[in-house]
Amino acid sequence: MLTEIPETIQTPAKPQSIWKIFVVFLLGALCFLVTQILTRVPLLGWLEKQTKFLLWAMSYPLFTGILIAMSAGISEESGRFAFKSLAIKPTKSQFWEPVVFGLGHGLCEAVWLLSPIWAMAGLLEPGQIVLAVVERLIAIAMHIGFSVMVWNGFQLDQRLRYLFLTILAHGLVNALIPLAGKFGLG
């Protein structure tokens, strides 16, 4: 059941060394860099140069938008899963770990996406900047939540189930963007 809280999360956390917290934070940021900047974004860039893909995307814009949204969920959540499996031990962990990992992931994404906005801040209305920052704060909270979901799969020994559910949740959240555009809400 998704509402179960694993025993290891219920126990009070032992004081963690700043170093371990910092490493988990950096691994979260690295996960974003690997799954998005070094992998998904270049693949999407290559794909949009393909004539057949462009024709297909223009024929089915909403479906294409939803598929691209789902690709973010697949990419990022598979990355979280791989980092937890390969780089962050033990399998059972304290609650702070996915929170710090998600914070690293989300802040790295925020810096990457907000940097161009800061570069042209003088040209924007204050409300536009506030809106961008609020959107990123919500996204950071979502990244923390997605990390907790993936980690719960490890805690409950239901890794693939939780990976699938997290990919689905992430994809559905991202699919709201093309859906909002389709209905004039974007």
What are these regions (language model features)?
Residues M1-G186:
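Hydrophobic alpha-helical segments at protein termini of multi-pass membrane proteins
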